[in-house]
């Protein structure tokens, strides 16, 4: 972004007006009355200390308040609403985009005392906490119960959960597991008027929309997070890291391409390129590749062998390390690189930003970064997440050079423009904030930006929750016409089905394309679409299944259906152009996550025309596992016992037939090695149980047959004893088959749901935001 494009942080003219100052003074008095004088500060030092983060941006508040609990938080937000004063939540201030800085002054609300762990469920794998809880604390609580919380940004020791949710934080392991949004089960959100909304995972199945998707990555523009319930995954049985050293950057990039072309998916795949030092073509610096491997022992052993062979084939020197040795080795290597860079260039400081391109474009993007470094005259390192195309170009600079800021911004703008041309995104984990606001119009067509503005109005009609972030105003967006038009032209898509193997992506541009069609297109290759809708047949349309919000047989492992959606196209109103949501990058946190709302949209947001879906490696072994018939309550106890063994089930539950008999039913899968050892563990857990273990097509599993479409709707209700047992008995008594899914935490059957739709007024406003005609 150039200086001319950059907003004046914290210097909004309206914020300097006498009426604004008077409103802030009134709000300060309200806050003192609510919290006490010691929790409300407006002195110059406090204001300065909360005017910056890890970016180059600045934004000065009028006052800073520190609530003690959710009641305080709601009261503060309600007071700000009453006085018409903007507010912004602030955690640890580690953001790289200025997201937690006040663009229009007003009140900064600190989450430092909202730091309680509210609940830890080690049986179900859930943690509920307040927004000020440090990420490392969540990780520690998870580890004590044998679980892991996967998002792991580099600031994990100080950053907070509220900030992670607001920015949709990722980290190295977002490659294998996805960003923060994939792990949010529920959010308590204080709306900008002080009221409280609870958004949870069940809403898409109960007539609502999955509004959690909007909160993750919204940068606090839709309200204040009061608490978040987070999904945990089982701690891996085995964990190693392959470190490979390459003399040439091109060979490291070729290794990355082959890794994905052959269908490998490491839990993390990061790269540290050789340094680019202008005027020093002789500067020799190796490139390093770090591949994280997590999972069951068979998976890690198989992946490490394959990765090492690929690295050697491209001239790399691989070595396999345990985690402590890797962390020490990486710290030494990075420290040495930085010291040598500073010594060679004379530039002691660095500027870090992020951008994203499809991983198939990584080699071209590295060439673009090299050209931008030469054009700017800046020495550059690039430590980045090679597996998902999320780059972190890091130019070094001399702060005493009066032109350094302009050169840094010109460098970042040049790289981002190149990403745009490759079909990339503005951000993969840092967010938009103030830093990239002026570039949103170049990456998003006007109709998509208008939907985002309408979503903002639906949550925040008065525009008080962190205004001036994420979405440019209509006036700002109007300035980018020619480049927007070029992007719109590129959105013309060829009908049919297209597989992009290195990107592990399938593009479906025809509602007639079925799951069988996708399977045929992927046959013989290393990838699969991990989605078989419960009770469906392979002849079902993929787009129809997503639009209906049909639950997956395999859920949440390896992925929830909504988390497979990288991009989607909607026809909203007759005569209007299709609106494009998301894109085709494995990692994308630019703007609101509108694309995930199409899961369960049921035509209410528009007609779903196209989707871009993430693919995953095929399992090397997949077995159907079923216990004998037994009473319902006995089957529930056996299912709970089996869950404690931490076996690689992609789904597990209790299947109740129409005749009333029940059995524990599931499927185990590995992506590397065989299941033989795990089947032995299963037998040892329940020695008296004669398990029936078979192979076969998932589409013909007993659960799929029991819930097959009979002309009635697929209905469900939240699971949980003793209500769950009574529900299963009632369904069996009525001659209906049912499946209690531990992954969904829900009971499924064919017929009428037991309770009315949970469509809220907020859902209605979001639907209107999509349907409204563009300005």
Which residues does each PLM region occupy?
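C-terminal substrate-recognition/cap domain of FAD-linked oxidoreductases
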Residues: 41-50, 230-234, 240-411, 418, ...
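Activity-critical C-terminal alpha-helical subdomain
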Residues: 438-487, 758-775
